[in-house]
Amino acid sequence: MPITPQEALQRTIEHREIFHDEMVELMRQIMRGEVSDMMVAAILTGLRVKKETIGEIAGAATVMREFSRRVDVADRQHMVDIVGTGGDGSHTFNISTCAMFVAAAGGAKVAKHGNRSVSSKSGSADALEALGAVIELQPEQVASALAHTGIGFMYAPVHHPAMKVVAPVRREMGVRTIFNILGPLTNPAGSPNILMGVFHPDLVGIQARVLQELGAERALVVWGRDGMDELSLGAGTLVGELRDGQVREYEVHPEDFGIAMSASRNLKVADAAQSRAMLLQVLDNVPGPALDIVALNAGAALYVAGVADSIADGVLRARAVIADGSARARLDAYVVYTRQLAVQP
């Protein structure tokens, strides 16, 4: 017998786990709109208070993938997603979006799953729009962009229409729920490799093990000790690495890669225009902490994608494609191509 919403709520109140298969059925009911808003809010609150387990998160992510509009990609070799849970409150420029262009220029295929702003002043979707790209592409258009430019951006509302069912509840609740950590786990292109930033240190090991359960090939899940959901320059970064079916947790520091430490306040922006300006400075090879943090995160993406042998090797490759202009050229090519896609009948 599938678990009922009432039984699920009771479990959370008693701090007992909703098992993986039960969570799958419960999430299907929620995504089909069969559970009342009041009950959805109660269950989400109960899960948050008791703390979601690996099995619960993996079960919920499985259903979100089921209900998504998929991007068909024939060759996933060297494919990577660079994504964060958001919610770290850092208000930095869009580091992961800038790293996307660098990683693509360095030889990775970047299938980035993103949305509008959560923790930064400019989310990945906001940043791409400010750069002139078209973000609301259909799945087949994303596949075409990925094939032609090495970059495919999947705007979450296009690919997860079923999320409209829970959007009003999430908006009214106004607090983090399991859905905040599901987005990065539900890449519509099925990227087998992922660089994921998280907003809490506990999630480093949890999300790495969820990805392991979901069948990912390689992953780096990161949290900076200064609170950033990126590999940080301002402090050490906790890392959960999935490789060869095993999860290993460790800590890295910017000095390990020949990068000077720098406080995150040096990366802060007030709005999308400032974020755009800082991103372009990086791609135009202007030295400073913004370039350093992009090289570090793009280097990690190249490592997890299997292009680089190590993060350090990835950082060198990232700096090279920024310096020779190919990362900036990749941005320009992507903007032009998405505009062409948007006007095609």
From Swiss-Prot:
<feature type="binding site">
    <location>
        <begin position="112"/>
        <end position="120"/>
    </location>
    <ligand>
        <name>5-phospho-alpha-D-ribose 1-diphosphate</name>
    </ligand>
</feature>
<feature type="binding site">
    <location>
        <position position="124"/>
    </location>
    <ligand>
        <name>5-phospho-alpha-D-ribose 1-diphosphate</name>
    </ligand>
</feature>
<dbReference type="InterPro" id="IPR005940">
    <property type="entry name" value="Anthranilate_Pribosyl_Tfrase"/>
</dbReference>
<keyword id="KW-0479">Metal-binding</keyword>
<comment type="similarity">
    <text>Belongs to the anthranilate phosphoribosyltransferase family.</text>
</comment>
<dbReference type="Pfam" id="PF00591">
    <property type="entry name" value="Glycos_transf_3"/>
</dbReference>
<feature type="binding site">
    <location>
        <position position="84"/>
    </location>
    <ligand>
        <name>anthranilate 1</name>
    </ligand>
</feature>
<dbReference type="GO" id="GO:0005829">
    <property type="term" value="C:cytosol"/>
</dbReference>
<keyword id="KW-0028">Amino-acid biosynthesis</keyword>
<keyword id="KW-0328">Glycosyltransferase</keyword>
<feature type="binding site">
    <location>
        <position position="230"/>
    </location>
    <ligand>
        <name>Mg(2+) 2</name>
    </ligand>
</feature>
<dbReference type="InterPro" id="IPR017459">
    <property type="entry name" value="Glycosyl_Trfase_fam3_N_dom"/>
</dbReference>
<keyword id="KW-0460">Magnesium</keyword>
<dbReference type="GO" id="GO:0000287">
    <property type="term" value="F:magnesium ion binding"/>
</dbReference>
<keyword id="KW-0822">Tryptophan biosynthesis</keyword>
<feature type="binding site">
    <location>
        <position position="170"/>
    </location>
    <ligand>
        <name>anthranilate 2</name>
    </ligand>
</feature>
<comment type="subunit">
    <text>Homodimer.</text>
</comment>
<dbReference type="Pfam" id="PF02885">
    <property type="entry name" value="Glycos_trans_3N"/>
</dbReference>
<comment type="function">
    <text>Catalyzes the transfer of the phosphoribosyl group of 5-phosphorylribose-1-pyrophosphate (PRPP) to anthranilate to yield N-(5'-phosphoribosyl)-anthranilate (PRA).</text>
</comment>
<feature type="binding site">
    <location>
        <position position="229"/>
    </location>
    <ligand>
        <name>Mg(2+) 2</name>
    </ligand>
</feature>
<feature type="binding site">
    <location>
        <position position="92"/>
    </location>
    <ligand>
        <name>5-phospho-alpha-D-ribose 1-diphosphate</name>
    </ligand>
</feature>
<dbReference type="GO" id="GO:0000162">
    <property type="term" value="P:L-tryptophan biosynthetic process"/>
</dbReference>
<dbReference type="InterPro" id="IPR035902">
    <property type="entry name" value="Nuc_phospho_transferase"/>
</dbReference>
<dbReference type="InterPro" id="IPR036320">
    <property type="entry name" value="Glycosyl_Trfase_fam3_N_dom_sf"/>
</dbReference>
<feature type="binding site">
    <location>
        <begin position="87"/>
        <end position="88"/>
    </location>
    <ligand>
        <name>5-phospho-alpha-D-ribose 1-diphosphate</name>
    </ligand>
</feature>
<feature type="binding site">
    <location>
        <position position="84"/>
    </location>
    <ligand>
        <name>5-phospho-alpha-D-ribose 1-diphosphate</name>
    </ligand>
</feature>
<feature type="binding site">
    <location>
        <begin position="94"/>
        <end position="97"/>
    </location>
    <ligand>
        <name>5-phospho-alpha-D-ribose 1-diphosphate</name>
    </ligand>
</feature>
<dbReference type="GO" id="GO:0004048">
    <property type="term" value="F:anthranilate phosphoribosyltransferase activity"/>
</dbReference>
<feature type="binding site">
    <location>
        <position position="96"/>
    </location>
    <ligand>
        <name>Mg(2+) 1</name>
    </ligand>
</feature>
<keyword id="KW-0808">Transferase</keyword>
<keyword id="KW-0057">Aromatic amino acid biosynthesis</keyword>
<protein>
    <recommendedName>
        <fullName>Anthranilate phosphoribosyltransferase</fullName>
        <ecNumber>2.4.2.18</ecNumber>
    </recommendedName>
</protein>
<comment type="pathway">
    <text>Amino-acid biosynthesis; L-tryptophan biosynthesis; L-tryptophan from chorismate: step 2/5.</text>
</comment>
<dbReference type="InterPro" id="IPR000312">
    <property type="entry name" value="Glycosyl_Trfase_fam3"/>
</dbReference>
<feature type="binding site">
    <location>
        <position position="230"/>
    </location>
    <ligand>
        <name>Mg(2+) 1</name>
    </ligand>
</feature>
<feature type="binding site">
    <location>
        <position position="115"/>
    </location>
    <ligand>
        <name>anthranilate 1</name>
    </ligand>
</feature>
